[in-house]
Amino acid sequence: MQPTRGDNVLDLVLTNEPFLINNVEVCSPFSTSDHNSVEFQIILNSANTSYKFSSKTVTSRPNFNMADWHAIELYMQNVDWNYVFSECTSCAEVSDRFYAVVNECIQLYVPLKAVKHGKAPKRHYPPFVRKAINKKRQLWKTLRKFRTPELTARYRVACKACRAAVNESEKRFEDSLVQNGNLGKFFRYGSAKFSGKKNVGALVDSVGVLTNDPTRKAEILSQHFQSNFTFDNLDNCNVRGHRSGQILDNVDFTAARVEKALNKLKTKTAGGPDGVSPLFLKRCKRYLSAPLAIMFGLFFEHSFLPFDWLLAYVSPIFKKGDSSKPSNYRPISLTCTLCKIMESIIKDEVLHYLVSNNAISRRQHAFIQRHSTVTNLLECSHDWVVCLHDHHSVDVAYVDFSRAFDSVVHRKLLMKLESSGVCGKLLAWIAAFLSGRQQCVVVEGFQSDWSAVVSGVPQGSVLGPILFLMFINDVTDDPVNKVSLSLFADDLKLYS
């Protein structure tokens, strides 16, 4: 038995099952504590659990960071896409031929890497922090063998130096976030610091049983997300005809547009169900923009989407509250990058048309250029201050639509789009984009069964937010007398 604070044994591991605990070891103190940490293993036999530890689940995937980019660019440069597509008689064949060329290139010049699921990613510190950590560890090992006042003092100095190095590293990173000006990264960092919840905890199923099996957790969340869907009651919604007289029924896919969309890809994001990395597409944009423009044009003309484009890997994101309740998680869909590229071109065209023709309510502040939570708050604050200045009271009601993104009925959404002037081939392609979708939930690398998506717009897609705006757009029609309202996506404020 080893001491855990000075020469005293204060920290104990107690169990009524001696065979449950293994490899008890006294290690270095945690953070700023003056107690040594105690590490041990809990052994669970196959009778107590129905799954293997996810930390031992290893899969292989392409490591695009180690790809031979010179060979890849040379390979893609020599592809005769006119010949590749020449004998295709359907959109499905065009898709298959394109993916065959891309996948062959990836297999030839992109090495595989082993990926362990269920393990938290290692933190990557700069060299000066790693040096301080290693020095602290070495002194700790020496101190365990020769406990002298001199070594104890040196170890304490090393601990302080290590903490200072970590704090300096964090400070430099936060300074770089501020100077970079990327608001998305800044708010994601802040949100992660305050929430502290990244993974899926143990979940309670429908009969009240708590489980930590990742496969079972994926199934529980999948069933919950399915329960959020809304089935069409077949009632016709009252839609108003668009007032401008303009229509949007076509989108042109040019090589220049496709290359521009490829150039905007974030290379550190994951690929979707088709396995094609955004990094690969962006690095090969000069050679892929022309064939993709041809392919997108054919898909648009025939209202076609490849099978993989209708699939989504759903990552459950914890919101707040009790982490064991499935209702406190929201689904974020990971879809194919190529589909997102086509969506982005369509989205730009649709959004420009809607804004130019005042088809989106001016009270909506989400997903529109030069609109944000700031403009939403400024508008409301201005109205409230004016009322108070005129010695009037202000009553405010906050409305949150439950499961708003998941409850969008596709048929009614298409009716509202058509009433705003979106029609023809464009409306037909959007209908194909929404229908026949499937999703599976992924938890710690384990997947649920695939399930049909009968309503909603995919959260995580490019077109999804704009489609949702059009679905909720008429909530601002026919306002109650002397009642104003303001929207940010599905968050509604009513005030008078």
Segments (PLM) and residue ranges:
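Surface-exposed loop/turn segments and immediately adjacent short secondary-structure elements
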Residues: 37, 41, 45-47, 69-81, ...
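Alpha-helical recognition domains of nuclear gene-regulatory proteins
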Residues: 75, 101, 105, 132, ...
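Conserved pre-catalytic core of RNA-dependent polymerases
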Residues: 218, 225, 248-458, 496
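Conserved helix-loop-beta segment at the catalytic/binding core of cyclic-nucleotide signaling proteins
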Residues: 479-486
